[in-house]
């Protein structure tokens, strides 16, 4: 189904519409992929998007983790290749990664892709945040689809077009057997008429996307500099969010100031003190920095008063 939408996506991506599958958000496609493949064993680096593991365990799959280390900047290392073995059915990679925003070098992805093909492993690469990178064309694996039938790319409208809640994502692969199997396990009419219309209209908005990208580049630079000035340890995110390490009570401090930030301590492989903030308008970003500055100052003053009282007691 959804022929006009699939045709519009195919034209936008420069692929055949037979290679496109649409989903109720990229998350639905992750689940239908797992239901279709029924993997026994899968590999994911952590921290990463939690839905991969959720989808894998929902179909009884055993999940192996490769820990991305703080001292290595949470980037995927060459040693990841050594974790690939013939018992694996699937590997999930997110580029750039969520929540860290750290990208994976394309040459390295080629190596992973080749080894996966040799070992008959399906490689799923989530490119939902790729459009926020300065040169997305240098990172996408789209050109490899025709040669590698073990490759599945995930994309979403949510991030690129600020369409959260409309629920529209898509996948691209030249593995027709896989697409047929996914269609079998996907409920019919999974995409509303409104989501289809919004998707077709959004794909024509090239100027809006470029404008949004430029704003993200500009504001991400501002946020990174300001967060560093506040003493936070900022990681080199290439997405439309910033990942950093700060005081363990920063979430509560911000809430008191009327600002919500994402506490990342519930991500597998992360401890307390890691946060992710979205890159928003300049005014909102200023408000965030102000809330952090005022909040941490207040907290420091209160802490000093407690120490003073303890000394006097």
Residue map of PLM features:
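PLP-dependent aminotransferase class I/II
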Residues: 1-3, 150-235
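PLP-dependent aminotransferase-like
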Residues: 3, 28, 35-93
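Short loop-beta-helix segment that forms the pyridoxal 5′-phosphate
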Residues: 10-32
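Short acidic capping loops at alpha-helix termini that bridge into adjacent secondary structure
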Residues: 16-20, 127, 149-150, 312
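Helix C-cap/helix->beta junction micro-motif
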Residues: 59, 118-119, 148, 230, ...
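Active-site phosphate-binding strand-loop segment of PLP-dependent enzymes
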Residues: 64, 71-133
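PLP-dependent enzyme catalytic core of the Aspartate aminotransferase-like
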Residues: 107, 256, 266-313
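Conserved PLP-binding catalytic core of the aspartate aminotransferase-like
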Residues: 217, 225-258
């Amino acid at each position: 189904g959804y022929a006009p939408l699939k045709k519009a996506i195919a034209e936008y991506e420069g692929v055949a519409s037979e290679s496109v599958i649409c989903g109720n958000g990229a998350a639905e496609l992750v689940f239908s992929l797992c239901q279709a493949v029924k993997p026994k064993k899968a590999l994911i680096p952590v921290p990463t998007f939690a839905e991969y593991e959720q989808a894998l365990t929902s179909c009884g799959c055993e999940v192996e983790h490769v820990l991305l280390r703080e001292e290595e900047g949470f980037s995927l290392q060459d040693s990841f290749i050594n974790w690939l073995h013939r018992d694996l059915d699937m590997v999930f990679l997110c580029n750039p990664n969520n929540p860290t925003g750290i990208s994976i070098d394309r040459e390295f992805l080629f190596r992973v892709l080749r080894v996966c093909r040799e070992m008959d492993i399906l490689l799923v690469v989530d490119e939902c945040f790729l459009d926020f990178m300065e040169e997305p064309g240098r990172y996408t694996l789209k050109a490899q689809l025709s040669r590698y039938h073990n490759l599945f790319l995930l994309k979403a409208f949510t991030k690129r077009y600020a369409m959260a809640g409309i629920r529209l994502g898509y996948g691209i692969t030249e593995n027709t057997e896989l697409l047929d199997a996914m269609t079998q396990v996907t409920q019919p009419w999974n995409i509303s008429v409104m989501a289809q219309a919004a998707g077709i209209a959004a794909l024509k908005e090239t100027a809006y996307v470029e404008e949004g990208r430029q704003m993200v580049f500009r504001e991400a630079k501002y946020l990174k500099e300001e967060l560093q000035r506040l003493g936070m340890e900022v990681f080199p995110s290439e997405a439309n969010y910033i990942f950093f390490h700060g005081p363990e009570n920063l979430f509560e401090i911000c809430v008191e100031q009327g600002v919500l930030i994402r506490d990342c301590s519930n991500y597998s492989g992360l401890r307390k003190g890691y946060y992710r903030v979205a890159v928003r308008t300049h005014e909102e970003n200023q408000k965030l920095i102000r809330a952090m500055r005022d909040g941490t100052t207040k907290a420091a003053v209160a802490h000093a008063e407690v120490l003073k009282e303890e000394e006097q007691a």
